[in-house]
Structure formats: C-alpha cells, structure tokens
Amino acid sequence: MSNEFRFRFPVGTTMSFAQYMDIALYDESFGFYATIGRAGRRGDFLTSPEVGPLFGALLARRLDEEWFALGSPETFVVVEFGAGPGTLARSIAFASPECGSVLRYLMVERSAEQRALHAEHLENWMGDLDAAGVDSFVGGHNPGPQFASSSIAPYGITGVVLANELLDNLAFDIVRHDGDGNFERLDVHHAEDGLEFVVAPTEVPASFAPVLASAAAGEWMPLQNNAVQWLTAAIDRLERGVVIVIDYGAPTSEIAARPDMGWLRTFVGQERGGHPLDAPGSCDITTDVAVDQLVAAVAPTVMATQRQVL
C-alpha cells in the first residue's frame, strides 16, 4: 500500500468497493492506469487489438457499414472510450477504411499517461485536446483521416461511439440478497493491519432488483451501475449513429454462481494477480460484464458474439 493511499485514506476509513476500485485504477497519483498499467504484449493484459491487425481491419469494415447506413455523411465521427495506448485506432488507420477521407477519430482516455502514447505510430494526430478543441475537431471538414486525444467526449455525434473492453473496468459494487428483497454489499475498510472487506446493508436501484434477484440468495455478484450509466450517456451523445460495445460478459446469475467470487479478477504482467485489496494501484481489477443488467436499462438493437458480428 502506497504512502499516498495511506495518507488520503487513513486507518478507520471505509468506502464502497466501487469507490475503492475507481481510485485503485484511475487515481492520478497512484492509480494503475495512471501509472504502470498498459495493454499489449509487453503490458499487463492482451485485448483483441494487441493480438494482431485483423481485429482492427474487421472493425474498420464495420465502421464503413455504419458510414454507408448513415448516408455517407461528409464528416464521420468515431469516439472511442477507454482508448488506452491507442492500439485500436492505429489498427483501424492501417486498414484504410473507405470512410477514411471524412473520418474524425477521437480517442477518449482518462489517463494522461496513456494519452501521451497516442501520437506513436499514428499519422494525422491532431493533439491532446481540451473541450473547445474537441468541438472544433469533430466539426472540422479538412480531409481525413484525422485522429485526436482527449479526456472529454463531445455531444451531437454523427457516427459511432465505440468501447472495446471498457465496461469490465468501470467500477462496480459487490452485492448479494437474502431471498426476501434485502441486500448487502461489501465495503472496503482500512484496518490497522491493512484493507479488508466488511459487510453492510444497502439498497439497490429499483431497475436492478429483478436482475439481481435472479442470482441465488447469498451469492455475491457485481452491481454494474457505472456501466449502465456509461451506456445511457453514450447513447445521449449521439445525434445519429450507433454505440458499439465489445466486452466479455455473462448473465448476472451465471456470474454469481462461480465459486469463491471467481468472477472478481486481477491481472498484472499478463498473469492473474492476487487479492484486489492487497496493494491498491498495483494491478488491473476486472470482472465479466453482467449483460442482463445492461439490457434491463437499454434494449440493444443487436447483441451477439464477437465472431457473429465481425
């Protein structure tokens, strides 16, 4: 545990697991993605873009399909959330999609360290933009493809909002029910000898209750309210177009049934890590996306396996 964490969250502090996870992954001083975490063959985990160029090439073809479906607009905006080091954008650029001449590709990433990597091997990179710069970028009419980075996403998008393996890294709570409509959650408490889980009564949003009740009583499961909020906000950013989310997932009941909370995983150096409370900021924390929690909030136009879509 870093001294920075100890200073900001002294002994006696208690927080929800969602608060803890967000800090452990994204805090600017010691968060995993803000300091040491990185995808890729030399990083801590592999996603499809890091395996090779084929995924990016197939997704480039999918972007062309969406561009044609929108009537081939003169400016076609792709906003990729959780862009990491920019590998997917580079793969799409290398594939030379037909929409490239009008493409404005914005890589949205919370981590300044990750954004600093976006210019590597990516031509026509227009910089790390503030809010005014983002609006100017997505509204521009200069020949594309053009790429830019920001921690800020625009509204009024004509194009595609894209997220590849983002939702599994959005902070979630850990809850269970007793079969009678009562819920408990795991909080994180800073005790004298380190961090520990403590159980506390809680309430869940009414829209989640039926889905969570599908799990057996007493089984811990992720409550992915942040993922649902991200999805609804992404849809609100569109004027015309689609949201494409790619991630690994399963129904809530299936996730909860895994023994010993096996769905709660950490990774470091491309290997499974230890307990998520052992050393905040030292590892990736992730879980399967509970797809039925998303569907309960927003009915998808298409939900299919990655193979079926690509």
What role is predicted for each listed range?
Residues 1-81, 85-157:
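Rossmann-like AdoMet
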Residues 4-7, 155-310:
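Class I S-adenosyl-L-methionine
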